[in-house]
């Protein structure tokens, strides 16, 4: 008889046939841990499985996939007002959130942490009162790259694929003119890259919001400004601390307005529009994380 409550593992269909994953699940089951497994086929499945998890009386719902899968499960838990904890099993291309919070790369270790690790309250962001992100919202150059990078290239090269595709597209990408407001913050101009982070990194390891914490009640903003991408990039790389092309801000909410349609990437999920309101919901979710997680204050 297991001393641990049952868990429900929600797998992105792309990672369901991973042999190491099957081995990790069977290993823990042999130890007496009760793990229910469900595989998503289309958008909305995660919400349905969480409703099932409530009926199964599990204490942890594990998101097995990339940043998009973690986002879908996390936002569904918050929308349902569930007290179940979120566990994380990194099976995606970039795994930005899992990497930044210190989830082990070894699947067996990650799965065990997701079930028996200590759960702590963390923040999550809501966007336009209908969707959200647990890690980061990115706009501009980075969003176009992650959206346009071919699936075959991502499968072959992982997070490096974003960099390669970005270098191929540098000469065609232009900035977005927009206005951004927050608590004691106002900026207007041409943005090459916008990062609004609950977490720190996106796009396969790019530290867009290096000071962000997931339990401080704040969103961290970083804007890379300028009209030409390559000169701005070289200026930033040469002297990041004093670069005139970087604007930082901190607030519990940000509003972005643009004269044209923009696209933000919310943990891998695109959202287009001319107006965005992003606000943090403090301590809205419980998540099983390593004891030395660097994103906790």
Curated annotation (Swiss-Prot):
Mg(2+) binds at residues 213, 216, 218. ATP binds at residues 40, 66-72, 93. GO terms for molecular function: ATP binding; lipid kinase activity; magnesium ion binding. GO terms for biological process: phospholipid biosynthetic process. Binds 1 Mg(2+) ion per subunit. Ca(2+) may be able to substitute. Probably phosphorylates lipids; the in vivo substrate is unknown. This is Probable lipid kinase YegS-like. It comes from Klebsiella pneumoniae (strain 342).
